[in-house]
UniProtKB/Swiss-Prot annotation:
It catalyses: [protein]-L-glutamate 5-O-methyl ester + H2O = L-glutamyl-[protein] + methanol + H(+); L-glutaminyl-[protein] + H2O = L-glutamyl-[protein] + NH4(+). GO terms for molecular function: phosphorelay response regulator activity; protein-glutamate methylesterase activity; protein-glutamine glutaminase activity. InterPro entries: CheB-like (IPR008248), CheB_C (IPR035909), CheY-like_superfamily (IPR011006), Sig_transdc_resp-reg_Me-estase (IPR000673), Sig_transdc_resp-reg_receiver (IPR001789). Residues 6-123 form the Response regulatory domain. Belongs to the CheB family. Its EC number is 3.1.1.61, 3.5.1.44. The keyword Phosphoprotein applies. Residues 169-355 form the CheB-type methylesterase domain. PROSITE patterns: CHEB (PS50122), RESPONSE_REGULATORY (PS50110). Involved in chemotaxis. Part of a chemotaxis signal transduction system that modulates chemotaxis in response to various stimuli. Catalyzes the demethylation of specific methylglutamate residues introduced into the chemoreceptors (methyl-accepting chemotaxis proteins or MCP) by CheR. Also mediates the irreversible deamidation of specific glutamine residues to glutamic acid. This is Protein-glutamate methylesterase/protein-glutamine glutaminase 2. The modification 4-aspartylphosphate is found at residue 57.
Length: 368
């Protein structure tokens, strides 16, 4: 029998601590070993028993969550799931938490927290289980995914975009599609900061809630040569530009002649995610086919696996991040299981692979 995941709760609200403990202990695989009102009390509790995962509030007395997180990562890296309010200020704070080493950030409302946590326990439990599997050796300064807490029914990409065979236009621009979840912000930062402005146009799904993706895109845009934007319907996918799907919406690739653009739309969560990697990858398979490169990276679950297989069947080049370099080897593993991955490579090799494969796509288009 597998050992339970030992969780420590750190939040200055007694109500939140009580509700969190109640909802988490409904899962037979989780054991709450303590609840602390602030990081000072948390450190005392950790001196007696070290947790597998820490659920940490951001704003607390005596020491704020970001300061404690930085201290923890410097002394003994431990998976941390941060709780942040779903506001513009909370989104900026979440980016600081990810940069400081949080494995995941979950959103909570500014009001009605008790009712929200009780109704949305499933997503928090899923994040804790993903965090418990995180390979902290691969966790440098920046990391992780942020997700909304509602756990919806599991729909397939059919609920958003019908399956069909797409055509390919010779001479159409090359494009790269990236999909990732837990550990993804760190991985995406690594890849995007190493790409020049003449790289292929890029479309990205990173599992993240509404309001958080804009802050994520803004941060990346400030440190990359590429133009990084939170996508809007009609945005053109052009060389030197990366478009990130907005939280709470699906992103689809469309084609007009030899040019690509994106469509942002609502619809049910697919594989319990909105945006969904499967939705993006299916649309890329249909719009770009063999003119595309698909990359599935670190993350929990199977979102993107079927879509990547559709890309491969449409003639696209497909790669998966290898287990050694993943924070959580879930999505690439599931894609490899069903034959969707042409080959697996380390995170360190992905930027050059994007450039090399982009060059080969250009050569193929010129020959065609």
């Amino acid at each position: 029998m597998n050992a339970k995941i030992k969780v420590l709760l750190v939040d200055d609200s007694a109500v939140v601590r009580q509700v969190l403990q109640q909802v988490l202990e409904r899962d037979k695989n989780i054991e709450v070993i303590g609840a602390a009102a602030d990081p000072i009390f948390a450190q005392l509790r950790m001196s007696k028993q070290w947790p597998d995962v820490i659920v940490l509030d951001v704003e607390m007395p005596r020491m704020d969550g970001i300061t404690f997180l930085k201290k923890l990562m410097a002394e003994r890296p431990t998976p941390v799931v941060m709780c942040s309010t779903l506001t513009s200020k909370g989104a900026q704070t979440s980016m600081k938490a990810l940069a400081a080493g949080a494995v995941a950030v979950v959103a909570k409302p500014a009001v009605g927290v008790k009712e929200y946590l009780e109704s949305a326990a499933g997503e928090l439990i899923m994040e804790i289980k993903a965090a418990a599997k995180a390979n902290m050796r691969n966790m440098p300064a920046a990391t992780a995914s942020a997700q909304s807490m509602a756990l919806p029914a599991k729909f397939s990409a059919d609920a958003v975009i019908p399956l069909r065979t797409g055509g390919v236009i010779a001479g159409a621009n090359k494009i790269a599609a990236l999909g990732t979840s837990t550990g993804g912000t760190q991985a995406l930062e690594y890849v995007l900061t190493r790409l020049p402005r003449n790289c292929p146009g890029i479309v990205i799904v990173q599992h993240m809630p509404e309001k958080f993706t804009a802050a994520f895109a803004e941060r990346l845009n400030s440190i990359c040569e590429l133009e990084i934007l939170e996508a809007e319907s009609g945005h053109q996918v052009a060389p030197g530009r990366a478009l990130i799907a907005p939280g709470g919406k699906h992103m689809l690739l469309r084609r007009s002649g030899a040019q690509y653009f994106v469509e942002i739309m609502s619809g049910p969560p697919v594989n319990r995610h909105r945006p969904s990697v499967d939705v993006l990858f299916r649309s890329v398979a249909q719009a770009a086919g063999r003119n595309a490169l698909g990359v599935i990276m670190t993350g929990m679950g199977d979102d993107g696996a079927k879509g990547l297989l559709e890309m491969r069947n449409a003639g696209a080049l497909t790669i998966g991040q290898d287990e050694r370099s993943c924070i959580v080897y879930g999505m690439p593993k599931e894609a490899a299981k069903i034959g969707a991955v042409t080959r697996e490579i380390s995170l360190e090799r992905i930027p050059q692979c994007v450039l090399d494969m982009g060059a080969s796509l250009t050569a193929s288009a010129q020959r065609g």
